[in-house]
């Protein structure tokens, strides 16, 4: 088998693992990693989007604001959580919690797992684009440490709205891209059946993105994927979070914000 075919197969296999219905979701990781978690609801404007969960958590007697884009564990829950595709009120809820974290000086931990923001007409009417854009602006200047972890799919602006952070991590078999391989193949090649080929061309794997310095670290998964040993995966994430916080401890606010800003300004130089 040629090297290019191997790369194509590897990328598509990671897409399939990232989308595996048994893969642990944000809710699982929050409950497993943190000692306590109190969920907060609503955007104080329209409603409570179940695709995004968030609240206040304790870990080693330290307080955090934790936000996650969450898929369901079965069909009924997936319908409830809109298959992990947030509405604008979900992003506004997330922003409300981020600003609350800033007020009380709590670090923010985000878990990302979405094929993309919901693109229905209702979401557009309620300002989906504006909600995502506002999150990008506010996260860039948020005056507390921010850590974001892509645990499955990281699709487009819907993922980026929770992934402007001081430290961005990806699980070993997660993916992060501007759109799905199927969408890429449909738009560029007018043939969605070439999705497997697109997955390789798009450079969407954690390994690709680390090579471009778009992410900071790859978190190793158990053999076969996170769903093969969810507890071990949660332990690996917990260890990585604590290490990252230790690295940022003592960093003054101006330095933190400047490094975050430069991190994103410099991405184009690495491509």
Swiss-Prot record:
All residue ranges annotated as the CoA carboxyltransferase C-terminal domain in the record: 1-247
Q: Which reaction does it catalyse?
A: N(6)-carboxybiotinyl-L-lysyl-[protein] + acetyl-CoA = N(6)-biotinyl-L-lysyl-[protein] + malonyl-CoA
Alphabetical UniProt keywords: ATP-binding, Cytoplasm, Fatty acid biosynthesis, Fatty acid metabolism, Lipid biosynthesis, Lipid metabolism, Nucleotide-binding, Transferase
Q: Which GO terms describe its biological process?
A: fatty acid biosynthetic process; malonyl-CoA biosynthetic process
UniProt entry tagged with the keyword Transferase: yes
**Do you know which Pfam families this protein is assigned to?**
ACCA (PF03255)
Q: What class of enzyme is it?
A: transferase
| EC number(s) on file | 2.1.3.15
Highest taxon in the source lineage: Bacteria
Q: Which NCBIfam families match?
A: accA, AccA_sub, PRK05724.1
Summarize subunit and interaction data from the UniProt record for this chain: Acetyl-CoA carboxylase is a heterohexamer composed of biotin carboxyl carrier protein (AccB), biotin carboxylase (AccC) and two subunits each of ACCase subunit alpha (AccA) and ACCase subunit beta (AccD).
> What protein am I looking at?
Acetyl-coenzyme A carboxylase carboxyl transferase subunit alpha
Instruction: Tell me which species this is from.
Output: Clostridium perfringens (strain ATCC 13124 / DSM 756 / JCM 1290 / NCIMB 6125 / NCTC 8237 / Type A)
